[in-house]
């Protein structure tokens, strides 16, 4: 029975009732097979219930008064810490902010590499003051030597970097933002436009100021917000509501925003055809769009790892090997990379 139920679309789970509507075989089995009907009816009663307790690894909820005045709480079964019983959406409805404090292993790798450079070469490196136009760094990225780099490793990203031939930190930021489901489909066009500026076009001239740094491609959530403000007449408050709708990936909320955005585009001078064309560029960001500050933060750390690997490869690869010392297969891969 489960094999007949399709997956949901991006950001939206498939329901049993919807599956019965759209899958003729499932609909027929439900109507004609008593056992199938009994199993599906039982499944419907459990649908939507929490299957297990999961805790966000980095989520911290803050409150002005004791937490239990806002949300039911319990002890985390694994660690003994107090956790909320509300999920992230209910927590927001209760008026509480949730902050994600993420740890990045690559920061420890950077620190170890910097320590080794100082010990061996007597050079003090401040990773926050590296030149952002280092030729060796961009040449290494263009060759696809990305193993051990933050956010830039992996076969898919490496292939795109070799095609892109990045030449600025902006290219790295853009790749960090685009390399995820949805926006990823724009990467080939981004590469084409970087290589041939004659291909850069804008649906409306007003988009030039917003998108000129990304060759006319919508790349960040910020691009969507500025487009809504500049071309649909949104206020900053309305744009922030659009951002929240995109971040939460709630289909019905996005549908309402789509209708409002299209109406705003048309009211502010776009034809219906161009308004829909612009929406088709915005829509992929509804599920996985990156904020520019987020992409720039990740992009900077990615560049820092690339700079150290390009300029101090022995020290950087030693730091990576130390970090992965508990994984023999990883260590073997690192040794193979070093031998190249």
Regions found by a protein language model. Give the residues of each.
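Alpha-helical scaffold/interaction cores of sigma-54-like transcription cofactors
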Residues: 1-340
